[in-house]
Amino acid sequence: MSRTASYAGMTTPVKDKEGHGIPCLQPIDVVECTYQYFTKSQNKLSLRVGDLIYVLTKGSNGWWDGVLIRHSANNNNNSLILDRGWFPPSFTRSILNELHGVPEIGNELEIFQAGLNLKLELSSNPVILSLEDFLDCCRDIEFKEQLAWSPIPVHERKGCCELLYYNQDLDVYCRTLPYLPQNQVETVNDYSSFPAISKIAGKKMPITSSPDLFYLNDCDVVYWYDLTRLVCHYVNLTERDLLANEREKFLTSLDLLTAQITCVYMLFRNLRLVEDSFKKTLKKLIYTLSRFSINANIWFHSTPFEEREAIASQKDPERRSPLLQSILGTFQKFHFLLRLLHFLSNPNELTILPQLTPRFFKDSFNTISWNNPFLRKHLNQHMSHDLPRQMIKAVAGASGIVAENNDEIPASKQGTSCSSETSHHSPSAPFQRRRRGTIFSNVPGSSDESDTIWSKRKKPYPLNEETLSLVRARKEQLDAKLKQMIKSANEYLSNTANFSKMLNFEMNFKTYEEVSGTIPIIDILENLDLTIYLNLRELGDENRVFDEDVAIDDEDKEFLKHSLSSLSYILSDYFNMKQYFHDVVVKFIIVAQHLTLEDPFVFSPMQNDLPTGYYEPMKPSSLNLDNAKDKKNGSQNTDIQEEEDEYEPDPDSLILFHNLINQDSDFNDLKFFNLAHVFKKSCDDYFDVLKLSIEFVNRLILERENLLNYAARMMKNNITELLLRGEEGYGSYDGGETAEKSDTNAVYADSDTKDNDEWRDSQVKLPRYLQREYDSELIWGSNNRIKGGSKHALISYLTDNEKKDLFFNITFLITFRSIFTTTEFLSYLISQYNLDPPEDLCFEEYNEWVTKKLIPVKCRVVEIMTTFFKQYWFPGYDEPDLATLNLDYFAQVAIKENITGSVELLKEVNQKFKHGNMQEATAPMKTLDQQICQEHYWGTLYSTTESILAVDPVLFATQLTILEHEIYCEITIFDCLQKIWKNKYTKSYGASPGLNEFISFANKLTNFISYSIVKEADKSKRAKLLSHFIFIAEYCRKFNNFSSMTAIISALYSSSIYRLEKTWQAVIPQTRDLLQSLDKLMDPKKNFINYRSELKSLHSAPCVPFFGVYLSDLTFTDSGNPDYLVLEHGLKGVHDEKKYINFNKRSRLVDILQEIIYFKKTHYDFTKDRTVIECISNSLENIPHIEKQYQLSLIIEPKPRKKVVPNSNSNNKSQEKSRDDQTDEGKTSTKKDRFSKFQLHKTKKKAPKVSKQRRRMFDFLLSVD
């Protein structure tokens, strides 16, 4: 940094006591810091508001050189710290001339200077500090940081052998080179490294000083310099109002100043700053403020207004009255005491101050009495209510415990008076509740009586049409009563002669009856199942680290993030609606109560005279005297404007109002309205909020369907699984007629013998040595299928010598990996092959056992193993431990024993494990048809609108069906199992090439169709493309190609296409109706009931099914059903967990897999056109992403300025239905605007204002943890 200065202080050489010449510094100015400035640089000064800096040099480059003196962090108050460095002058103001007029204030100035150990006598001429004064000042000064020296050799002068070192940054000479200690430099961000913090580091900080404990406003006081700036503002404002002769404003400013001084006193006590210097200064400060307040009030009361106006307008201070001069002198002393207090508090200025104003705890904002499901609950078994996480950490930290939640805090620290739930009913429980509670035990509403509806209801209401019907039915019941009440109010307004107390009491009674009927609606709003939105927030968190078994690519993450940003506003409006519902109901009750009062203003004295937030700190931008306004009057005027109603006043009330004004009576700004008119307006608001609740419930249901519809149509079963995880009813799968209607995971042991009676009776008639050993551990279902059993029982039934259950065998071999490892499964089979005979058998019984059981079982074992290796073997089943089984030796032993099929078994074993041809031996793992790619024939791409329109829709649909059916035939059962199991049972499955290729093709087709439309700038051509693709989708339906049909529909209902209203208007209505019929077929409501019915009607016809339904069924069946059944013994009530395999779950999976395989058997009898197929394949590559397409959509048809655009993630007609519903219920643009902007109050000119603090809370509840 350059040292060139416009003007600089003089450097006068002086000699010390030893006679050496050392330059002496001369300050040229004294400045006061007005704005905070922090820096990490060692050659710059960090400034706080109120600091005094002695300027040594004013550089031309905009930086000044100065010295800053502060108290040190030691307990000795006389110990000082000297800092020298560069600082920006724009953060300071010169006070050199102001210090001349400081009034006499007794010994405070001498005490202040004595504390500095300096003798500063500032005059009009610059003061030259002698070497002795400078050394005396710096003798006991401790440097805050080790200074960085840059020594520069000086040329030797004649007659002088002394070598001086010069620091260019600080412009200081020295004789010796100070070597810096090799200590690790701590970062400036660590507050513990500051001396300001070290002074109170050993003290126990208050709980409320935690930085992350509350939701804070921007204007909240956090550090000392914030408080100093706020107090100084009110001091200046009070002085200005005094000199301006504005009595009301002066009293308001003085009241606010007194409140801030009270906060200062409370902070000193909370921080335990009990030094004598603090106590004396605070007492003098309060005394001076009291004296100033008394004298100012005497001034305003004893002096007439005109005289005060004349005296205050005098510019010459000497011509003012002695009383005013005395008041101003007292105020100057108050100024000095504040500066002295700031100087004393400098060592603590980086301390986070305790919070004194009321604020919400973080993670605990529950929107008044409503439940907030987005709040992460940290429940403890000893506590009935969840507590704010930050409050738990603060209380635990104050108790010497490091804990993140309630579970890590001992019960003794949580304020619980009992060790178990039953202790509440003990005789000593009442006495325990009388003890002094802690912060945990005194949580409002912690009793059972004050629990919300949420805690009383076990199951939440699902987001479906049934819940919406409940709300609508209840609203219709309330509407009839409400219309009658409005009719009664209208009759009174038309004829006041019918006024009577009985009528008012009757309306009041009907109001309570009406409100009590609202409880079911409140119950539904309080207990809506918002699990899918909770999961969406968790998945949309950028900082979330997903488990290994969760496969989410970049495209999925972008979709989740986009959906979260779109739905956050809807959820925020939903919570605002719930709060508004609460406000309307309360107002409805209060207005009804007013009808029964003779004097409707009897409760007016209970109203607080001060507006809400009167003592709230002001924003930094408002701390300007030029822009400062009267806080009290301004707030009241704002409230009056916001709360101004459109009620028509009663004529009689107006006459009374004017009479009171003429009599100069105090009417306290009361408004005289017709109460019946007010009651009618409240009924209208109540009626509107009921309708609004239906709209929001319907909106949440539609958005939920949109999310699931997108995931299903894009075949993203992993997204569907993650979104629905934890939702009530998740995992329920209706597999058709074969599925059990009432299937529970708990099975009674005395009921598993009721099915399959005939076969079991035959088993009972057999000799004991021929009966199955584990037959009692099998659980049968109502459809004569094995529902569950132990591992031994399942293996025994698999290798049974009498009954061959083909479906059971297939299910077992397909899903065995979810029950056993490969080594364990084959070990069980080998053990079954080597059965031990029962004890106490005679020779004849033994021979019968060998002939009728052992040999048949051995044959069954060999047959099962051969079938397994030949048809159901997958390379991912290979394990290192399989070598220990010696399967080739086992097969050779079976050959020597002449077991049927043993030779073929040996062949399969050698082929799988010795020749290493596992990939070729697995017939299911067949690659895609590569003939087209091998010929390297490149056709013309469908890259233009003309080329796409030139292809006949029938030809396009035919070739598209052939291509997609070929890809569908490459899907194997292992692809499907890998898609749902992932790494759940084994990490060696690998990818699912066939299924991934099929899903990728469908998604590419969707992107190709949407991109082909949005890239076309001409509206008429876009309309032709829309009609063209609709016709292609219709022909795909005729060919039973539901996969391509769904991909086309998804593209046409995507956000970038659906919003093109002008383009859709150019499509003829018949074509749009055709698209709606296709979309109705693939409607996801009721688990794609229309599509499933259409699919069941197909018998032997070829078909390309929509695979998203299968993925959903597989995902729900696997994730929604447990792997094990719990056996409940009816007599003993004993639970034996994880013993009985839930085989019914595996059977359902195989049912779905069989349907997938079924449609691979029948092929289309179409002629393949390789040119068209090649063009289709090549056109699907390198398509821009959905975000790019949406940008193109905005270019061809920009958003209307005053119209709400649909959500970008709407992929079906549910949004169109939402628009229709809103149109039917609204019919007017006024109501639509009120709904979108949330301007709900009919009786007010403005919408209910949501504070900035509440908006910040909503942002926390719906964003990343």
From Swiss-Prot:
Region Disordered, residue ranges: 409-454, 623-648, 1201-1252
A single cellular component GO annotation: plasma membrane
Organism: Saccharomyces cerevisiae (strain AWRI1631) (Baker's yeast)
Biased amino acid composition, Basic residues: 1239-1252
Residue ranges constituting the SH3 domain according to the UniProt record: 26-97
One Gene Ontology MF term: guanyl-nucleotide exchange factor activity
Ranges of residues in domain Ras-GEF: 952-1199
Compositionally biased residues, Low complexity: 416-428
Note: Suppresses the CDC25-5 mutation in yeast (restores cAMP level) and has similar functions as CDC25.
Domain N-terminal Ras-GEF: 782-914
Keywords annotated in UniProt: Cell cycle, Cell division, Guanine-nucleotide releasing factor, SH3 domain
Keyword set includes Iron: no
SUPFAM superfamilies: Ras GEF, SH3-domain
Gene: SDC25
CDD domains in UniProt: RasGEF, REM, SH3_Sdc25
Protein's name in the database: Guanine nucleotide exchange factor SDC25
BP GO terms, sorted: cell division; Ras protein signal transduction
General function of this protein: Promotes the exchange of Ras-bound GDP by GTP.
Biased composition (Basic and acidic residues): 1214-1236
